[in-house]
């Protein structure tokens, strides 16, 4: 395989100009010989005495070039003047020794050998082409059987296998009328005589005529391979090799170690084996040795070549002297240490250094402190240049000396060189693009890099010994890009969610909080001040304190109509601290933003507001000032932690005693047998959970308030100045939960498997733990540490897969012109709005006009980017859904358009062309991955009981609306009974916006009507949580069928009430075999005794009772619509483990089918049940035209529908987790996207991580990029093959233009790993996973990599087609086209 075009330095081929694609194919023997500079005939490497390479050996200088620059081997020709001369004595050409890195040799094999990649990588390509099984081909190749290559006139079949005995018998019988061969020769003969074009024709006909699915799949696969060979002009027999290329010697070096030993590359060993065996075989053939010996030697040669190409792929791996398997050519390129991931995608670079980081609290945001020693080393060449320019040194050598002596002038020059020259800092792991940022260096003494505290959040850095790397951008372009795009002060917003990432934390927050808190009756309370300067004087002369409440006149800056600032003076009631803080506010930011106690969230809002109102530059300056102020007041405040700050609540002892008494009572009940062990455990856990909460509440009440005397002399409560409370309250450090452990009680602990230990830890850290309590605590804590280590690796792998699947998504055009999009609504769960509509549509582009619901006028036209102003307007006008453009529906073929993506979150305006949005999406989802939990949650005691709700209440005033799936009937009492499966009551506020959405189960009684006005707290619906009713939709007289006591039903009498009921028995447990198949059903008769039919059909109403149903009606009873026929007791809802955290995100993106997946209705129609099989029930859905769709469902599963019920396509009919593939098939792309976005967001929301929906949508786009051809039409695709969506669109457009029939296709959902591997670019796929398979397939297909993605371009070393690289490539293409046009024109004129 000529993979080598990946590796050889491209200059040698005279390819100075850029290339735009790389093609891979199978090398023909002629090609291999044309690469070669001579045949390697001997296995010798170098002479152990002279260290000179042996002639014709593996390191031969005659073949591969001289060992020393411009010097032949025997030393006759030396120096440059003989360049190009070939020495007549030793035959070596005089040239540079680096040609030994690129000159190849070859080995002429004495017998053909099959290439193991085409034989063994599944599915076997040789097997596919020849239509033989891998086992058969191996038997032929490894000389266990003959294969008939030409049957002649005999009854033998072509490709038939014969054992040795068979062969000799047939020889006796038919003489030489037929040909049969053994080994690679036989296979090669078969390949050579295969008529590819004819075979394709036959297969196409077979495809038309056959009906079986497996056959179609098999034929389609074979067809694909044969067509690829036909198209690319490669010959089938090239998969069998006559000539073996030999890698250039400097790529498989042999290095002499001291003591006469050698370190060598494994490849040399492998090559030696091949040459030895090949030479032995040649000799045997010359001697006409017996067949059996020759065959053995040929087999050994085949095995030696196998090992060289891919050791260990077949049989045992060849091992070296030390028993470890040798590293073959295939091992060189695959895996983490292989060529792709080690050397091509990540390289070590020059002009870099690393050191420990420390705090630089006096720096400005765009600066960092760089140790002088490091700077001197990093900027050496610049310093040499300056020294020479200033005449202080005449040569580089002299300059070097000066620098090493560190003469004073050098430091002055260093200052000069470093000025305005940004450097890049990087902290590993680089999880998102903010892991590398540019700074202007400030020279400092010492050896540690100083980092600005506000960028720590982006780097996820702290100062407990973290190290960071420094890189110097050298070229002018690189410096420009670093300064304009990467400078820390240009990256204020996070690309994941558009919120500021430069947010103060810890000490700064604490200082600002302390500064802006107010105190009751502080010194000088109630004073009035003329301006801030006066406040300053009063504060510094100690007339007032920091927290004193005062009134002050403040000057604010407001924009007028012309957009210029003018001062406005207002009086504010505020505190001294806030008034002082107002001085650093940027122009245009109102004072009310700081006129409150600043906690972390408030500070974040403050910076966000500043960015939106005052722009980037002012915000950066403001952030810096906030930092200096915060640090200053944190120091002056002297807030520290003392043991006495952890106040233990007085009520603790009483609360503990109470809880202990309750537990004792439960234990007694358990001993008397009144409760089961499970109930006892749940209740005990419950009691202790509540006790812990009560103690925590008492403690917080105690901590958060303190009694003070106000000016009037009354005792009042004010917020406490307890240090620990202030730290937690401000959001600087710690939380209520941690304070609870310090001075409340530690509470319940979990075992490593997630279950809760019922003995709580009643002490806290201040009191100290007993030995037993300490042991219980360590149990779960250790799990946490193990989790964290695993989590990091898993999260990294998820990120890698995400990056791989999206790496070629770049914004390439401004607008694709589509009007498709998704309808966005607020996310409502239960009764709460989790994410408001404005947050979901902010920064998107509208797909259709947004219309005011009350007046009907257009608020926003289609194609508008929604800014803060616009979304606020939409919000106020009461619009509850907006159709916006989304990456999933973008029509751009390779890449995305700016309008479908919307706002670039990190810049706050429409995304630029060239932005690598795919990678940004992958990083935004992967980066918080390390914060997600690994554990799958077990719902503990307290949570599972809350699940058995029996009614639902409105939380707000408004109007009740029923969802479109809502189906209900009114019963005789006039109650509305729900008979639909996925019914919801939605509550809209007075302007028609959705406020809450409640699911209502089947059989619930609705207490509201559609369109009714309701009050908060009103009950909307009630139901019995413990049973599931079976409800009739028709009225009539009950007539039972197959309801026989003792056969299909059993009578049960309640001991307490004495009432008897009928319960349906499970078919397996019935006595006679005949009764096993009987299904107890109920039919309805009208007053004339005729069976009632389903309206509009002639099918009688018939409803089957499921197993375990308690029948509540009697034979002959008159019933009305909505009456209950039977109740099915619900098993107390089993606590299903919900997969949470990282594994859940991975599961969604890998599009895995969930365990125990639920089932959706394939068609809209009526449900009935067919004949049961042993463990399964047969569920039939019949549509309006009477077409039935059957499925078998195992009896353990809970079927949510019953006989005669009408279901809609895509509605859930069997309980369980939903399979995303089903959603796509039955409900379409929008429903699927909504499901995945919702589920992924759910996981991140639990951890309090904000990620913009569009990142998830970008990944969904990539998961949906392939389609299955359902009917090829006249497009040349093969029915059933998987192709890129863009290719089908293009082919269909072309077909329609030519008036041909377009192809029909079905959407396919691929998991991210699969999607990465099925990409068009083989280079990208090979560098991701399964390198061997990807390259084999690509070579057979003769694939061409268009180098569209980022990865392929990094690998071949071009500028990536994103950012500035996009414009570079575009202008290059334009120039090239212009040149082509010119040449075409000149040719025309010449002619």
Swiss-Prot record:
Broadest EC class assigned to this enzyme: transferase
GO cellular component term, pick one: DNA-directed RNA polymerase complex
Chain residues that bind Zn(2+) 2: 816, 890, 897, 900
Record's catalysed reaction(s): RNA(n) + a ribonucleoside 5'-triphosphate = RNA(n+1) + diphosphate
GO MF, one annotated term: magnesium ion binding
Binding residue positions for Mg(2+): 462, 464, 466
Binding site for Zn(2+) 1: 72, 74, 87, 90
One of the protein's GO biological processes: DNA-templated transcription
Cofactor binding annotation: Binds 1 Mg(2+) ion per subunit. Binds 2 Zn(2+) ions per subunit.
Reported cofactor(s): Mg(2+); Zn(2+)
Keywords: DNA-directed RNA polymerase, Magnesium, Metal-binding, Nucleotidyltransferase, Transcription, Transferase, Zinc
Top-level taxon in the UniProt lineage: Bacteria
Coiled coil: none
UniProt-listed Enzyme Commission number(s): 2.7.7.6
A Pfam family hit: RNA_pol_Rpb1_2
Subunit structure: The RNAP catalytic core consists of 2 alpha, 1 beta, 1 beta' and 1 omega subunit. When a sigma factor is associated with the core the holoenzyme is formed, which can initiate transcription.
Similarity-based family: Belongs to the RNA polymerase beta' chain family.
Family matches, as NCBIfam families: rpoC_TIGR (TIGR02386)
Functional description taken from the UniProt entry: DNA-dependent RNA polymerase catalyzes the transcription of DNA into RNA using the four ribonucleoside triphosphates as substrates.
HAMAP family, per the entry: RNApol_bact_RpoC
Full protein name: DNA-directed RNA polymerase subunit beta'
Record organism: Neisseria meningitidis serogroup C (strain 053442)
Source species taxonomy: Bacteria, Pseudomonadati, Pseudomonadota, Betaproteobacteria, Neisseriales
């Amino acid at each position: 395989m000529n993979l080598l075009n990946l590796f050889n330095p491209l200059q040698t081929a005279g390819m100075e100009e850029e290339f735009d694609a790389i093609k891979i194919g199978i090398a023909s023997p002629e090609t291999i010989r044309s690469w070669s500079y001579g045949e390697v005939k001997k296995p010798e490497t170098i002479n152990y005495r002279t260290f000179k390479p042996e002639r014709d050996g593996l390191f031969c200088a005659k073949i591969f070039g001289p060992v020393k620059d411009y010097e032949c081997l025997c030393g006759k020709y030396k120096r440059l003047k003989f360049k190009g001369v070939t020495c007549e004595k030793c035959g070596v050409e005089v040239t540079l020794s680096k040609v030994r890195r690129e000159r190849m040799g070859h080995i002429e094999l004495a017998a053909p050998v099959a290439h193991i990649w085409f034989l063994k990588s599944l599915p076997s390509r040789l097997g596919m082409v020849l239509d033989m099984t891998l086992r058969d081909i191996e038997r032929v190749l490894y000389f266990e059987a003959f294969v008939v290559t030409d049957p002649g006139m005999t009854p033998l079949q072509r490709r038939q296998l014969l054992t040795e005995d068979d062969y000799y018998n047939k020889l006796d019988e038919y003489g030489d009328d037929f040909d049969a061969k053994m080994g690679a020769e036989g296979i090669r003969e078969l390949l050579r005589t295969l008529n590819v074009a004819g075979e394709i024709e036959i297969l196409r006909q077979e495809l038309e005529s056959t009906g079986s699915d497996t056959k179609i799949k098999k034929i389609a696969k074979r067809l694909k391979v044969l067509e690829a060979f036909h198209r690319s002009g490669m010959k089938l027999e090239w998969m069998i090799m006559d000539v073996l290329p030999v890698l250039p010697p400097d790529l498989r070096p042999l290095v002499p170690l001291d003591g006469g030993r050698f370190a060598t590359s494994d490849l040399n060993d492998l090559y030696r084996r091949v040459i030895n065996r090949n030479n032995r075989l040649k000799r045997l053939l010359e001697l006409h040795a017996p067949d059996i010996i020759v065959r053995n030697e040929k087999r050994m040669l085949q095995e030696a070549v196998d090992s060289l190409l891919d050791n260990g792929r077949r049989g045992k791996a060849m091992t070296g002297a030390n028993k470890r398997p040798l590293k073959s050519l295939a091992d060189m390129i695959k895996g983490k240490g292989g060529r792709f991931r080690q050397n091509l995608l990540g390289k070590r670079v020059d002009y870099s250094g690393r050191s420990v980081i420390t705090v630089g609290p006096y720096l400005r945001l765009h600066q960092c402190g760089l140790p002088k020693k490091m700077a001197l080393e990093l900027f050496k060449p610049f310093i040499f240049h300056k020294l020479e320019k200033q005449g202080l040194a005449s040569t580089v050598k002299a300059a070097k000396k000066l620098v090493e002596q560190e003469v004073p002038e050098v430091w002055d020059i260093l200052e000069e060189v470093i000025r305005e020259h940004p450097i890049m800092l990087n902290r590993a792991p680089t999880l998102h693009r903010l892991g590398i940022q540019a700074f202007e260096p400030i020279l400092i003494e010492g050896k540690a890099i100083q980092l600005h505290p506000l960028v720590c959040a982006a780097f996820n850095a702290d100062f407990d010994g973290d190290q960071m790397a420094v890189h110097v951008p050298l070229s002018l372009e690189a410096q420009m890009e670093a300064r304009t795009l990467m400078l820390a002060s240009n990256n204020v917003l996070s690309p994941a969610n558009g919120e500021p990432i430069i947010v103060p934390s810890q000490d700064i927050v604490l200082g600002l909080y302390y500064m802006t808190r107010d105190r009751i009756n502080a010194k000088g309370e109630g004073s009035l001040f003329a301006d801030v300067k006066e406040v300053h004087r009063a504060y510094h002369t100690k007339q007032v304190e920091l927290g004193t409440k005062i009134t002050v006149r403040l000057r604010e800056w407001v924009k007028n109509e012309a957009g210029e600032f003018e001062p406005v003076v207002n009086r504010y009631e505020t505190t001294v601290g806030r008034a002082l803080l107002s001085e650093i506010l940027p122009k245009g930011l109102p004072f009310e933003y700081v006129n409150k106690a600043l906690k972390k969230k408030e500070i974040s809002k403050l910076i966000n507001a500043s960015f939106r109102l005052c722009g980037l530059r002012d915000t950066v300056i403001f952030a810096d000032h906030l930092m200096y102020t915060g640090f200053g007041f944190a120091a002056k405040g002297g807030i520290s932690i003392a043991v006495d700050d952890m106040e233990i609540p007085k009520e603790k002892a009483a609360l503990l005693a109470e809880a202990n008494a309750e537990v004792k009572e439960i234990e007694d009940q358990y001993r008397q047998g009144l409760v089961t062990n499970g109930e006892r455990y749940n209740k005990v856990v419950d009691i202790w959970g509540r006790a812990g909460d009560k103690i925590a509440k008492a403690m917080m009440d105690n901590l958060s308030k303190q009694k003070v005397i106000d000016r009037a002399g009354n005792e009042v409560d004010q917020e406490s100045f307890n240090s620990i409370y202030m730290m937690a309250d401000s959001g600087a450090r710690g939380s209520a939960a941690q304070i609870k452990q310090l001075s409340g009680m530690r509470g319940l602990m979990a075992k490593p498997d997630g279950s809760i230990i019922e003995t709580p830890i009643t002490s806290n850290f201040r009191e100290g733990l007993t030995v037993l309590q300490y042991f219980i605590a360590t149990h779960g804590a250790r799990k946490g540490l193990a989790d964290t280590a695993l989590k990091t690796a898993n999260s990294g792998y998820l990120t890698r897969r995400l990056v791989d699947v999206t790496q070629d998504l770049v914004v390439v055009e401004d607008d694709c012109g589509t009007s498709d999009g998704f309808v966005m609504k607020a996310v409502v769960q239960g009764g709460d709005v989790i994410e408001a509509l404005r947050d979901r549509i902010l920064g998107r582009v509208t797909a259709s006009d947004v219309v005011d619901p009350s007046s009907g006028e257009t608020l926003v036209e289609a194609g508008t980017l929604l800014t803060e102003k616009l979304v606020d307007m939409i919000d106020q006008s009461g619009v509850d859904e907006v159709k916006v453009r989304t990456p999933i529906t973008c029509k751009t073929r390779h890449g995305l358009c700016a309008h479908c993506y919307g706002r670039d979150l990190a810049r706050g305006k429409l995304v630029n062309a060239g932005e690598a949005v795919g990678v940004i999406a992958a990083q935004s989802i992967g980066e918080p991955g390390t914060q997600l939990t690994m554990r799958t949650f077990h719902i503990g005691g307290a949570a599972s009981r809350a699940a058995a709700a029996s009614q639902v209440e409105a939380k707000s005033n408004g109007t009740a609306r029923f969802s479109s799936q809502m189906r209900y009937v009114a019963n005789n009492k006039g109650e509305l009974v729900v008979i639909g499966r996925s019914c919801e009551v939605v509550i809209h506020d007075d302007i028609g916006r959705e406020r809450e959405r409640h699911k209502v189960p089947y059989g619930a009684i609705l207490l509201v009507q559609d369109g009714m006005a309701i009050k908060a707290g009103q009950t909307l619906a009630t139901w019995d949580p413990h049973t599931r009713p079976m409800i009739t939709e028709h009225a009539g007289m009950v007539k039972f069928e197959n309801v026989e006591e003792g056969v299909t039903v059993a009578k049960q009498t309640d001991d307490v009430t004495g009432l008897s009921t009928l319960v349906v028995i499970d078919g397996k447990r019935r006595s006679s075999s005949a009764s096993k198949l009987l299904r107890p059903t109920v039919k309805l008769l009208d007053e004339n005794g005729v069976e009632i039919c389903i309206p509009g059909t002639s099918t009688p109403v018939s409803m089957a009772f499921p197993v375990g149903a308690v029948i509540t009606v009697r034979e002959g009873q008159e019933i009305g619509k909505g009456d209950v026929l039977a109740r099915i007791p619900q098993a107390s809802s089993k606590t299903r483990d919900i997969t949470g955290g990282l594994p859940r995100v991975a599961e969604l993106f890998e599009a895995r089918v969930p365990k125990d997946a639920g089932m959706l209705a394939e068609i809209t129609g009526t449900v009935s049940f067919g004949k049961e099989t042993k463990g399964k029930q047969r569920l039939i859905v019949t549509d309006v035209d009477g077409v039935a769709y059957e499925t078998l469902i195992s009896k353990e599963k809970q079927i949510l529908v019953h006989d005669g019920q009408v279901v809609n396509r895509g509605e859930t009919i069997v309980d369980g987790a939903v399979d995303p593939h089903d959603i796509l098939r039955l409900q379409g792309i929008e429903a699927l996207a909504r499901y995945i976005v919702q589920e992924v967001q759910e996981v991140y929301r639990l951890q309090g991580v904000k990620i913009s929906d569009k990142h998830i949508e970008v990944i969904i786009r990539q998961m949906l990029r392939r389609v299955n051809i359902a009917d090829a039409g006249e497009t040349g695709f093969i029915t059933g093959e998987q192709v890129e969506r863009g290719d089908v669109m293009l082919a269909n457009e072309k077909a329609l233009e030519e008036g041909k029939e377009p192809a029909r296709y079905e959407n396919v959902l691929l998991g991210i790993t699969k999607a990465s591997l099925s990409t068009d670019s083989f280079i990208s796929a090979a560098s991701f996973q399964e390198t061997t398979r990807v390259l084999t397939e690509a070579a057979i297909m003769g694939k061409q990599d268009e180098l569209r993605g980022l990865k392929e371009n990094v690998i071949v070393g071009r500028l990536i087609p994103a950012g500035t690289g996009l414009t570079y490539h575009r202008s290059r293409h334009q120039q090239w086209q212009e040149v082509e046009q010119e040449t075409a024109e000149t040719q025309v004129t010449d002619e």
